A protein has these predicted regions:
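Glycine-biased, small-residue-rich flexible motifs in mid-sequence functional cores and linkers
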Residues: 1-142
Length: 142
């Protein structure tokens, strides 16, 4: 399994790090030029990924990370992926933008079910309600 994500803090960074720790490949799709590491807290991971996977961007080198770039890059994340797994998402989340793009592209969408009322589970629970496959154990995805 290869991980394709946006190198963001939290679940994205953990997924990239986990793939690398397991000897896998991982790819970061940036919302800026490939010469920018954003967020800067992922600098070490960014450099390792350059050697054990890749850093990709539709933005030219020298393009800074701007807020409106991140929703745009999410369609590339889904386009490069065979399937999307949303682990946690608030009701307004970039992960939901990626899931919507995946559905438009005919990709399978998985979501980790969460507790009702948990703000970080609202997006996943909504995706499941709308037809995403509940991923409560790894075998469902694999």
């Amino acid at each position: 399994i290869q991980v394709i994500s946006g190198l963001a803090r939290g679940v994205d960074a953990a997924a990239h790090a986990g793939a690398l720790a397991a000897g896998g490949k991982t790819y970061g799709v940036m919302g800026c030029g490939v010469d920018f590491c954003y967020p800067t807290s992922s600098r070490k991971l960014y450099h390792v990924m350059q050697q054990q996977g890749g850093i990709l961007s539709e933005f030219a080198p020298g393009t800074p990370p701007l807020s409106y770039h991140f929703p745009l890059r999410n369609r590339i994340i889904s386009g490069l992926s065979g399937a999307i797994l949303v682990v946690e998402a608030k009701e307004k989340s970039g992960s939901l933008i990626t899931a919507d793009a995946a559905l438009e592209q005919g990709r399978t969408v998985f979501a980790l079910p969460g507790r009702a009322g948990d703000l970080l589970s609202e997006g996943c629970n909504r995706l499941i309600y709308q037809g995403a496959i509940p991923a409560w154990k790894p075998e469902i995805i694999l």
